[in-house]
């Protein structure tokens, strides 16, 4: 199997981002976005997806968290696209439901090359530790659009910290499952012959 790794940079007037990704990693991460709670979520994503991940972001946090969260998701999505290349041998589909105390999140993913996003539920508080709660939903949408994922997510609970963390863990576990190589498959998991 070839290395499924990527290194992607994104520089705009709003953010300067460097991301490295190893899909077949051990869950090691080095994250610095300037938003402590977002760093915690990306670290959790790396840990539970067993992705080796580095994210360095210098964003316009003097304005708000929107550009930082969105642009990290865009860059991470591009990294997944690069690392998975032609997607040969991947399982493609996966779903996971993850609890965290009273909260539960679900993610259903298809690494289809056809970006589509649905979200069910609301976050219980407006923000957590410097991150606006609705940006967790926007992160998933931006990741979906830039990694070519059909992604259906949902959350339920009473504590936004728990809801968002369960969401990131569920996303990680789903992507870990969907990106795994099925040794029985030598081609792409599509009747079209490509994804």
Curated annotation (Swiss-Prot):
Q: What highest taxon heads this organism's lineage? A: Archaea
Pfam families recorded: IGPD
- EC assignment: 4.2.1.19
Group of enzyme by EC: lyase
- What cellular component terms from Gene Ontology apply here? cytoplasm
What's in the keyword line of the UniProt record? Amino-acid biosynthesis, Cytoplasm, Histidine biosynthesis, Lyase
Reaction(s) catalysed by this chain, per the record, are: D-erythro-1-(imidazol-4-yl)glycerol 3-phosphate = 3-(imidazol-4-yl)-2-oxopropyl phosphate + H2O
Cross-referenced InterPro entries: IGPD_sf, ImidazoleglycerolP_deHydtase, ImidazoleglycerP_deHydtase_CS, Ribosomal_Su5_D2-typ_SF
Q: Name one GO molecular function term.
A: imidazoleglycerol-phosphate dehydratase activity
Q: In which pathway does it act?
A: Amino-acid biosynthesis; L-histidine biosynthesis; L-histidine from 5-phospho-alpha-D-ribose 1-diphosphate: step 6/9
What is an annotated GO biological process for this record, any one? Answer: L-histidine biosynthetic process
User: Gene3D superfamilies this protein is in?
Assistant: Imidazole glycerol phosphate dehydratase, domain 1
Query: Where in the cell does this protein reside?
Result: Cytoplasm
What family does the entry list?
Belongs to the imidazoleglycerol-phosphate dehydratase family.
Which HAMAP family has this protein been placed in?
A: HisB (MF_00076)
Kindly provide the name given to this protein in its UniProt entry. Imidazoleglycerol-phosphate dehydratase
Q: Gene encoding this chain?
A: hisB
């Amino acid at each position: 199997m070839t290395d499924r790794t990527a290194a992607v940079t994104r520089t705009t007037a709003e953010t300067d981002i460097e991301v490295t990704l190893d899909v077949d990693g051990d869950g090691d991460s080095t994250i610095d976005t300037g938003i402590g709670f977002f760093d915690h979520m990306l670290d959790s994503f790396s840990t539970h997806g067993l992705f080796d991940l580095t994210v360095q972001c210098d964003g316009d946090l003097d304005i708000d968290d929107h550009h930082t969260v969105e642009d990290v998701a865009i860059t991470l999505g591009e990294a997944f696209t690069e690392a998975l290349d032609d997607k040969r041998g991947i399982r493609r589909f996966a779903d996971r439901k993850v609890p965290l105390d009273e909260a539960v999140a679900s993610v259903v993913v298809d690494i289809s090359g056809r970006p589509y996003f649905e979200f069910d539920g609301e976050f219980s508080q407006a923000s957590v530790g410097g991150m606006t709660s609705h940006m967790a939903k926007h992160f998933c949408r931006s990741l979906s659009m830039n990694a070519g994922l059909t992604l259906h997510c949902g959350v339920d609970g009473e504590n936004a910290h728990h809801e968002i963390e369960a969401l990131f863990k569920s996303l990680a576990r789903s992507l870990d499952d969907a990106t795994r190589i099925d040794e029985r498959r030598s081609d792409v998991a599509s009747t079209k012959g490509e994804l």
